Each structure stands twice: as structure tokens, then as C-alpha cells.
Regions:
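C-terminal segment of classical bacterial N-terminal signal peptides
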Residues: 24-35
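Short, Lys/Arg-enriched N-terminal segments with co-localized hydrophobic residues
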Residues: 1-9, 36
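Short, intrinsically disordered, charge-balanced linker/junction segments flanking boundaries
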Residues: 34-38, 481-483
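Serine-hydrolase catalytic core recognition
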Residues: 372-483
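Bacterial N-terminal signal peptides that target proteins for export
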Residues: 7-22
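Beta-propeller folds
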Residues: 37-383, 389-392, 399
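Solvent-exposed, flexible loop/coil residues
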Residues: 15, 19, 52, 273, ...
Length: 483
């Protein structure tokens, strides 16, 4: 797509030619694309019942490549690096889903990627979830684990080996990794023994896998937060009951001023009654911490100065629902907006440029779906955008801020291309006690948006918006292939 006069965006060609995308689609051994709008019931069941083809995507620092997680035969998932200029596809990783599954892959430089896989395995008869980080080159070579290697003498088995907390923009192939350390037992008679324990931070060179310690591991630390510029500015501890050894739900947080290694008390967060400030993200450019804080019975968004004053400012509140997160952008990960969910997932941009761009793109993309800024190139000029809605399963686009052009990269469900999909309508269902229960009604194509009685419209589907107060989770307005 290209930006025309008056801010109108016009359609342009795809990055992947139809033949190239069809080849990738077929090579995955996923499913043959059925004839649009003319399929049999069996074909429709196959198309709607299959897994999403595109399961995740990231864009390289140059903006010239993407890494795409795609569904393959059976329960397998493949990670492919795709050159957007030549449409060349390089497979870099694959899991069979028995039990390992690829969760995500992201660029840590033009030639280096980090992926996470995991699954569920039985240990002593109990199902235990696990996740592990690996690094791999963009050509598929040099795949290696990033966490501490497993030891037969390890005191325990870790479910997670760590996480990437800073992608260190500008430092090719370098990342800050929050790393889990496990000490060894039965050390008698061994010359070399592991004694470190807990959560620490290492700067990892992905070429050599050599690590430079940034924060020494500690057993009581639950999290570290970086400012996106390579500096650890916030850390949190969990409080454990000394008698039972159980976690209490209380967390204490500390922060550092710029260019300082001295920790300063930030406060306590109680996850049981949700009092205190819960850290979400550090904006290094503003030198502030964005956090959730209970105000008027709802989680609001506040910003706390990290200059030593701890000056607090309320950024946004919502008297109906909780604000649940922030939206970040660019190599330094500056905060540009916040998120919440009512009848649908919503993003509010307090950055004027992105607010205007979001409005323009929403009008330009077919069916006017919900637009989210997924990732960006290192210079922030190439944006990876996801457009999705109730009648649009989702399509990834690349937007150039310099030329104001928008090009399609790949649809999430290509087998549904051209099919008329059912719309989803937010409604309120009255309960016997008069309380209104939020819900979603999936209406069959051709209903004209009218709500029928189930006897006259047996294909309509109703689902609750909330999944129960105990979990705090909820459904949202979106496309659901199985509804």
C-alpha cells in the first residue's frame, strides 16, 4: 500500500509473490488451500479446523528479513528466515511438538537469532512445564543452547533457563540474559563444582556464547528490568514464609538512578490484594518506570521517576476495567501507549505520531481490522504490523515510514482467504438476578447482524466474555475459527 493524498493509503503488491507463498505453504506439509467460497463441508471443516499457518513473526534490524514461525506436518512447527527482497526461505529450526514446541524466534542482530521452545514432560509422574532458549544463525547454522548446561549433579531441575531482558540495539549478536543458576550436590571428589544459585544477568556473545556477568545470581530475586540501553535499573525479590517455605505473594522492588550501582527502595507489591505499584516497563529516554497501581478499585497506569525523587504521575485510568500493559517501540523500547480489554482488546497511544498512524492504517487495511505495531527495524523506519479482527483472521504487513508504503507479508490463515467469515457481536446477557453478563455472539454470514432465537438460528454461537473471577481472565472480540 502507498500513502496517497490526504493521508489515504492505497494497496500495493505482496512481498512474497503468490507462487513463492504457495511453495512455502505447500512445503510445510500443512494443508492444501481449498477453493474459496466453493468448498464442500469436508473442505471447510479441514480449513477451519487446522492450526494457524503463521504462528509468530519478527523483523530483522535492517528491515529486509523476517523470521516466521509456521505450522508444519502434524504437530510440528518450523522457523523460517525469509528475505523480503528475494523471497528466499531458509529453515533455521523445527520442533515436532512431542513435546517440544517452538514458542518464538527474534532477531538479536542481522545474522543472529534467539528462539524459545518448551513443552510438558513428566518428572516422577507429575506433568511439568519447561522452556529453554537457543541461539541460531540466520542461515540455520550454529544452533546452541543459551542456558546453564544440565548437570547430573544439579540440586534440582529448572523449568526455565532464563529470558532475554535487553536486545542491546547497536551491539550485533549481543543480548542481556536473565539466567537461572543451579548449584551441584555431591561435590566430594570433584575438582570443579558449581556453587552459584539463583537468578542473575549475563551479557551473552551469541558468536562464542561467552558470558560476562552483569548481576550476580541471588536466590531471592524474582526479576530484573533493563532500560533498553544495557543498564539494569530495577530488580524485584519475592518474600517467602520462613516457616512454610511458601511464597507469600509479596514482592519488594528496588531501582537505580542513571549511572549508579546503588539500589534504592522502590516499594512493595502485594499480588493477593493488588496493593502497591507493579512494574511494567522502564523508559530509559524519559528515565521513568511505568507501573500498574490500584486506584479507585481498578488498575491504573502510573509513571514513577527514577531520578531519586520517585515523583509519581497518573498516566491513565479506566473506571470500568483494569489497564493491563504498555506498548513499546524501537531499539530503546520507549513506551508509546497502554492496553486494556473491555468487549475487545484496545490500545491507546499517547504518542501523537503513532496515534495518527494507527488511525490512518486502520482506515486503509481491508475490512478495517484492529491494527497493532508488532515490531520494528533498528532505526524504527520499517514497522511490522498485524491487522486482525472478527472477520479477518490476521495478516502481517510491513510499513515504511519514509515512503509511507504498506506491503503484505503473509496472512495467518491463508486457507481462509476469500471465504465469508462469521461476525462476532459483543452483547450483554441478563442473569436471573438482573446482573448483566458480557458475552460474544458469533453470527452466521447473511444474518445482517440480527440476533435470532437458537431454534431459528442454530449456527449462532454464544460465549461468555469472562472465564471466572478466580482467574481474572477473559475472552475478547476476535476471529475464532472453531466458533
Amino acid at each position: 500500500m502507498a500513502m496517497g493524498k490526504g493521508g489515504v493509503i492505497k494497496l500495493r503488491h505482496h512481498f512474497l509473490a503468490a507462487a513463492s507463498f504457495a511453495a512455502l505453504f505447500a512445503a510445510s506439509s500443512f494443508i492444501s488451500v481449498p477453493a474459496a467460497l466453493a468448498g464442500t463441508l469436508a473442505e471447510d471443516a479441514k480449513a477451519f479446523g487446522t492450526r494457524e499457518f503463521v504462528r509468530g513473526m519478527d523483523i530483522s534490524p535492517s528491515g529486509k528479513r523476517v523470521v516466521m514461525l509456521v505450522s508444519a506436518a502434524g504437530s510440528a512447527t518450523t522457523a523460517n528466515v525469509i528475505d523480503l527482497d528475494t523471497a528466499q526461505v531458509t529453515r533455521i529450526a523445527q520442533t515436532d511438538g512431542k513435546p517440544e514446541k517452538l514458542y518464538w524466534c527474534s532477531f538479536a542482530g542481522e545474522e543472529h537469532l534467539v528462539c524459545q521452545y518448551g513443552g510438558i514432560e513428566k518428572i516422577d509422574g507429575d506433568p511439568i512445564g519447561f522452556s529453554r532458549l537457543i541461539t541460531v544463525n540466520a542461515d540455520g547454522s550454529k544452533m546452541r543452547p543459551m542456558g546453564q548446561s544440565q548437570s547430573d549433579r544439579g540440586r534440582y531441575v529448572t523449568q526455565s533457563d532464563g529470558d532475554i531482558i535487553d536486545w542491546l540495539p547497536g551491539q550485533e549478536g549481543q543480548v542481556l540474559m536473565e539466567r537461572v543458576y543451579v548449584p551441584e550436590v555431591g561435590t566430594t571428589g570433584h575438582l570443579i563444582n558449581r556453587t552459584k544459585e539463583g537468578l542473575g544477568v549475563d551479557q551473552i556473545d551469541l558468536d562464542t556464547l561467552k558470558g560476562k556477568n552483569v548481576e550476580s545470581p541471588k536466590t531471592n530475586v524474582s526479576t530484573y528490568m533493563s532500560d533498553g540501553r544495557g543498564n539494569i535499573r530495577v530488580s524485584g525479590d519475592w518474600k517467602v514464609d520462613p516457616n512454610s517455605g511458601q511464597m507469600t505473594g509479596l514482592f519488594t522492588y528496588r531501582y537505580r538512578k542513571p549511572d549508579s550501582k546503588t539500589w534504592i527502595d522502590l516499594g512493595e507489591y502485594n499480588s493477593v490484594n493488588r496493593t502497591g505499584a507493579y512494574p511494567l516497563a522502564i523508559d530509559g529516554e524519559r528515565n521513568v518506570l511505568f507501573a500498574r497501581k490500584r486506584i479507585g478499585g481498578r488498575d491504573a497506569l502510573v509513571q514513577i521517576s527514577l531520578d531519586g525523587s520517585m515523583a509519581e504521575k497518573v498516566v491513565a485510568t479506566n473506571d470500568k476495567v483494569d489497564i493491563d500493559g504498555v506498548v513499546r517501540f524501537g531499539g530503546g523500547q520507549r513506551v508509546i501507549g497502554y492496553t486494556y480489554a473491555d468487549e475487545s482488546r484496545r490500545v491507546i497511544y499517547f504518542d501523537p505520531e503513532f496515534d495518527k498512524l494507527h488511525a490512518s492504517l486502520t482506515k486503509a487495511v481491508p475490512k478495517k481490522p484492529s491494527i497493532s505495531f508488532h515490531e520494528s527495524s533498528r532505526d524504527g523506519q520499517q514497522l511490522l504490523i498485524l491487522a486482525s479482527g472478527d472477520t479477518a483472521p490476521g495478516t502481517f504487513y510491513k510499513y515504511s515510514r519514509a515512503t509511507r508504503t504498506l506491503k503484505e507479508v503473509a496472512p495467518i490463515r491463508p486457507e481462509l482467504d476469500g471465504k465469508i467469515l462469521a461476525s462476532v457481536k459483543p452483547i450483554t446477557v441478563p442473569a436471573p438476578d438482573g446482573v448483566g453478563i458480557p458475552a460474544y455472539l458469533t453470527l452466521p454470514p447473511g444474518s445482517g447482524g440480527k440476533i435470532f432465537r437458537p431454534s431459528s438460528c442454530p449456527t449462532a454461537a454464544l460465549r461468555r466474555a469472562t472465564n471466572g473471577a478466580s482467574t481474572g481472565s477473559r475472552n475478547s472480540w476476535r476471529h475464532e475459527a472453531m466458533r
